[in-house]
Amino acid sequence: MTTTGPAALLARLTSPGAPAFAVLHRRTPRLAPDTVEVLLGTVGSHDTLADLPVRTGLPADGPRHDLLALVPYRQIRERGFEAHDDATPLQALAVEEQYAFPLADLLAALPQQPVRLEGGGFDIDDEEYAGIVRRVIEDEIGNGEGANFVIRRDFRARLDGFTTGTALTLLRRLLEQERGAYWTFLVHTGDRVLVGASPEVHVRQSGGTVVMNPISGTYRYPAGGSDLDSLLAFLHDPKELEELTMVVDEELKMMCTVGDLGGQVLGPRLKEMAHLAHTEYELRGRTSLDVREVLKETMFAATVTGSPVQNATRVIKRYEHGGRGYYSGALALIGRGASGGQQLDSPICIRTADVDPATGELVVRVGATLVRHSDPYSEVAETHAKAAGVLAAIGARPGPARSGGTVDGGGGAAGGGARRLADDHRVQAALDARRAGLAP
């Protein structure tokens, strides 16, 4: 890591001829809290995950990042599964420079420019999406094609006068407004911009340990903010319990493949964010596999496809009329530890705005998890809630309501001292009761 200050670096990134770059705020055990990393380099495209140029050997100056890969959903065809081919490229930023700053210092340097939004709306309206939900429940789940499926819809708009400064402004807003995100990030490849706040680990690997983090079940905060009664009702809702149980079961299958040396299940836990909360588990295993093989065998999480995953890809292809781009794919930060061992940190690419920097055209893709007990209009509301964080950042939705029952929890820049609802003993008891349903 070098010592260039954040203001000078951001001035460089907003100048003509700036290199491709990424700004990452990651919640990972290997990184000091409230650290933001900035990576600069060159971008290349690759056909398969095996083609990613993963480096080996001892790094010269201690642990370092070598590569940031953008893995599109269409890459799931490497596993023999179906997907619309929308030609979204598997790209990788080869890291040539890397910097780390305290979050507060970076926020002080990030721009606060006006964001001008033109148009804006879902490509599939609420009634049409509710109709799709009904058909999937009746024709797919009802006929035994699978236990749950995630069907997306797209919010599309245009950011007038879009520049790199606009992208950095959106990142600033997400850092300030969102909480509980695993990664809050901006990636600018030159011809594509991704800016988002993903709550969910796709897969993490270090020192032979591999971690997955299935998240499912969505508690949408009431208009006045979260409260204990509505949270407990959510935790005791059979539909929400069913969602989480099914995706954990599916991702345990993946863990049995990549965690070839054994593993364990931790949780469930509550993940509180700005507009909603989720229930989650953590799966841990020991692996002997290369990071590229781990990425391949975990394409893609049941939480963003469905279960069984292979059947889910067929249902997705039937009900979604085009490709998913990077939605439900992954970002993958690959590097080496001080001893030369492989390191991987990969979030699922959700809650993300995908922007064409040449035109300002923007798409935010979101989906709801459909199970046999799903209510179509509740699933419509779930897509609105999942999009809310990014849409608030671009000015298409109001910012989050704050509640005395939750605290920032370290996700957003503005901290707080209030007690989290997850710390209440009744919430913990409800979460513990869910674990009783897992096989020992």
Task: For each feature predicted by the language model, list its residue ranges.
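Short Lys/Arg-enriched alpha/beta "domain-start" segment
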Residues: M1-D47
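A short, Trp-centered hydrophobic/proline-enriched beta-strand micro-motif
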Residues: A18-R27, A147, A181-V187
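Short, flexible beta-strand-to-coil junctions
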Residues: V23-A32, L70-I76, V187-D191, L333
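Non-catalytic accessory segments adjacent to catalytic cores
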Residues: T28, T42-G165, G207, E240-E242, ...
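An anion-binding catalytic pocket shared by soluble metabolic enzymes
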Residues: P33, R153-E242, G335-V363
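Short acidic, Gly/Ser-rich segments with clustered Asp/Glu that frequently serve as metal-coordination loops
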Residues: D139, E240-T257, L266-R269
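A short alpha/beta connector and helix-capping loop motif
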Residues: T257-L276, L283
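Conserved hydrophobic core element of enzyme catalytic domains
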Residues: R286-G405, G417-L431
